[in-house]
């Protein structure tokens, strides 16, 4: 009798373990209306995005393919196969890696999903346009890839650093900021729908474009106007260089050639500064807290 009970218990334990293993093999990831469910846990993961590669590296997720990019790919993936330029992968390479999941950005979905579908490779697209979305993606990836402990540690550190900034801001006067970017041929100012707007909000800064162009509320950028800039008279002007002009002139040389800048508070405060395009040209992703701290230093220190 005891022997039979032991056998039954062993069978039950075996079934429980089997079900547990099966459950672990399943994979689910979702964000807003995007959802992907697989009946297996992916082992050969590729990303075609430099931004996404930094999220995955922070969570210690192994990849078999990453993009070639002017934006730095994490050192963790130094020996990993390059699949072509960000947003323009070499599909033959992707296929040859026996890829079983591609993680990309929502921005790339319209162009790339049909191509991946033709290869019968599942793909998922993350929205990382804003600071808050980037924080959400850390949690989403942590849950999907069973890296909750790492994700929680990252988010805890970010929360702590946010609290330090919040304390520093208590005795600071809010500033009016203009963020200008371009290549010397044309210039723009960041609108309310730009990644940088979320950072400005978090350090109590006003984006001057809201007083210049009502449509800025819906845009990532608005055309630059020197006349409007002088009228708005920002406390701080941050320049985001993207490249040199055709004549080889730098962003700074072009601005120095125009003495009208001297009429602004920013000039008088010695607060016309160039900012790092690596952190600020687009969403900084998992490094968004670094961008927030850096923006604070540019504005207030």
Stretches with model-predicted labels:
Residues 133-136, 143, 152, 166-167, ...:
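Structured C-terminal subdomain patch of bacterial secreted/periplasmic proteins
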Residues 128-140, 178-199, 245-248:
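Extracytoplasmic ligand-binding site segments that recognize negatively charged/polar headgroups
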Residues 47-97, 101-106, 205-208:
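A short, structured surface patch at a secondary-structure boundary
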Residues 31-33, 81-92, 214-226:
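Short helix-initiation/N-cap motifs at beta->coil->alpha
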